[in-house]
Amino acid sequence: MEAIAKHNFARISPQKARLVADLIRGKSVDQALEILTFSNKKAAVLVKKVLESAIANAEHNEGADIDDLNVAKIFVDEGPTMKRIMPRAKGRADRILKRSSHITVVVADR
């Protein structure tokens, strides 16, 4: 049985979020939560909330035992990019890309 949780339009670059996602892929949920708790990356906070939501979904919807769950799948897709302008010298302007992500976590029995 699987339980899914998503965070769409998370305000973090997909490249940075994938670094954290790679740390917990395939791990047990206890181990994954421990890794995310002590990680000092901004993405770790967002991924941890999604993982906790997936665990709660598994427990509530499927009646799963938390001790038997592991991170079956985790992936970070690219969301829409907000384009912003930064004024520069001599009337020029640079574009700033504020990237967003769609974080998906799937937990399943071992």
Swiss-Prot record:
This protein binds specifically to 23S rRNA; its binding is stimulated by other ribosomal proteins, e.g. L4, L17, and L20. It is important during the early stages of 50S assembly. It makes multiple contacts with different domains of the 23S rRNA in the assembled 50S subunit and ribosome. GO terms for cellular component: cytosolic large ribosomal subunit. The gene is rplV. Coiled coil: none annotated. One of its GO terms (molecular function) is structural constituent of ribosome. Belongs to the universal ribosomal protein uL22 family. Keywords: Ribonucleoprotein, Ribosomal protein, RNA-binding, rRNA-binding. This is Large ribosomal subunit protein uL22.
